[in-house]
UniProtKB/Swiss-Prot annotation:
Function: Catalytic component of the NatA N-terminal acetyltransferase, which catalyzes acetylation of proteins beginning with Met-Ser, Met-Gly and Met-Ala. N-acetylation plays a role in normal eukaryotic translation and processing, protect against proteolytic degradation and protein turnover.
Localization of this protein: Cytoplasm
Protein source organism: Saccharomyces cerevisiae (strain ATCC 204508 / S288c)
Other observations noted: Present with 3310 molecules/cell in log phase SD medium.
Top-level taxon: Eukaryota
Name listed for the protein in its UniProt record: N-terminal acetyltransferase A complex catalytic subunit ARD1
Family: Belongs to the acetyltransferase family. ARD1 subfamily.
Principal place of residence: cytoplasm
GO MF terms, alphabetically ordered: identical protein binding; protein N-terminal-serine acetyltransferase activity; protein-N-terminal-alanine acetyltransferase activity; protein-N-terminal-glutamate acetyltransferase activity
Pfam families the record matches: Acetyltransf_1 (PF00583)
Length: 238
């Protein structure tokens, strides 16, 4: 299914907040999303799709939909809006919320960014969406804001996220911050140095093409070997 990744806008923040509430225990007020988008409009990204045949438990319950009362009507009708949809036929399936470090106590630090939140709807996971969102954000931080490094926090229990950050995106674990989250769970504090030449999106496009070619070669070799074995068995039977 086609997935489109683009910069997040103010028009996306209701759907971004909905995805956050739907998937993560760390939640934010609407104004915090607005602060990110208005202050660093190039840094945050959303993933959307117009192919809507992948609907299951992630779909909003009727009680979760937003109610809108229509003014100027005689019967005072209300309609329910699905907050997963950015527009008719366009559904948000993931986002990454990013900012530059604006801590006044760290003004002497070189320019650096922070990954505030990353979320992908459950039905659309294991498709590389989170990795693509992150790579776009890292490239934007370096190219647009000249960030020298980026930081984030991740729950110790979140093995999938840790694998993405550490093994796929080459973040390093700096420390363990005790009771970082409201429920008392510890967090890994992670950091990645940003080098523009390593972050070029084309690098990873070529890598994926090569991986696909290698997989195709492996499949062809496997099919050829299977044919040879079958032919050998047939010769023995004859």
């Amino acid at each position: 299914m086609p997935i489109n990744i683009r910069r997040a806008t103010i028009n996306d923040i209701i759907c971004m907040q909905n995805a956050n509430l739907h998937n993560l225990p760390e939640n934010y007020m609407m104004k915090y999303y607005m602060y990110h988008i208005l202050s660093w409009p190039e840094a945050s990204f959303v993933a959307t799709t117009t192919t809507l045949d992948c609907e299951d438990s992630d779909e909003q319950d009727e009680n979760d939909k937003l109610e809108l009362t229509l003014d100027g009507t005689n019967d005072g009708r209300t309609i329910k809006l699905d907050p997963t949809y950015l527009a008719p036929g366009e559904k948000l399936v993931g986002y990454v919320l990013v900012k530059m470090n604006d801590d006044p106590d760290q003004q002497n630090e070189p320019p650096n960014g922070h990954i505030t939140s990353l979320s992908v709807m459950r039905t659309y996971r294991r498709m590389g969406i989170a990795e693509n969102l992150m790579r776009q954000a890292l490239f934007a931080l370096r190219e647009v804001h000249q960030a020298e490094y980026v930081s984030l926090h991740v729950r110790q229990s979140n093995r999938a996220a840790l694998h993405l950050y550490r093994d796929t995106l080459a973040f390093e674990v700096l420390s363990i911050e005790k009771s970082y989250y409201q429920d008392g769970e510890d967090a890994y504090a992670m950091k990645k140095v940003l080098k523009l030449e390593e972050l070029q999106i084309s690098n990873f496009t070529h890598r994926r093409l090569k991986e696909n070619e290698e997989k195709l070669e492996d499949d062809l070799e496997s099919d050829l070997l299977e044919d040879i074995i079958k032919q050998g068995v047939n010769d023995i039977i004859v």
